[in-house]
Regions:
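Extended two-metal-dependent nuclease catalytic cores across DNA- and RNA-processing enzymes
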Residues: 1-155
Length: 156
């Protein structure tokens, strides 16, 4: 009852993570100050100031760091959210694969290369599915599923 009395926000067709990401993008665009308080590692893909209330830490994620974290998840998957990554690629191997990739286009190219190697017949469909499950929306209008071409265009 207490939380309800403070007001709430109902979102149809949008996960809470996406709402946070959209609001963060709106704040960035408006040059407003904000801090995202959370314990969800997925939110670390979102640019801006973060506060982890379990660890009591404040830190900043820049755009490239957020994209890097997303690419790590595109390789490893996310067992909590039942998102399948690439077999045999855990966090350490994913970090090693991306270690010499500077810039979004290079990171995404490395992710694409890994998916092509693991699934030569249907890598494109699998990668697009993974992208659409992991990518956090930046605006209210992006309801459609992305294709690999749109994914590549979004990365630059």
């Amino acid at each position: 009852e207490y939380a309800y009395s403070l007001g709430h926000f109902k979102s149809d067709n949008c996960e809470a993570d996406d709402v946070v990401s959209i609001w963060a993008q709106e704040a960035l665009d408006a040059k407003e100050h904000f801090v995202i308080a959370h314990i969800d590692k997925d939110i670390d893909m979102v640019e801006g100031w973060h506060y982890n209330f379990n660890k009591e830490t404040v830190y900043y994620i820049c755009e490239d760091q957020g994209y890097y974290k997303m690419c790590i998840q595109m390789l490893t998957g996310d067992s909590t959210d039942s998102i399948q990554g690439l077999v045999g690629i855990g966090p350490k191997k994913a970090e090693k694969l991306l270690s010499l990739c500077y810039g979004k286009d290079k990171m995404l190219a490395k992710v694409q290369e890994a998916w092509q190697k693991a699934h030569p017949e249907d890598w494109k469909e699998r990668l697009e599915t993974c992208w659409n499950l992991i990518y956090m929306r930046r605006d209210w209008d992006s309801f459609h599923r992305l294709t690999i071409e749109e994914t590549l265009n979004d990365s630059v």
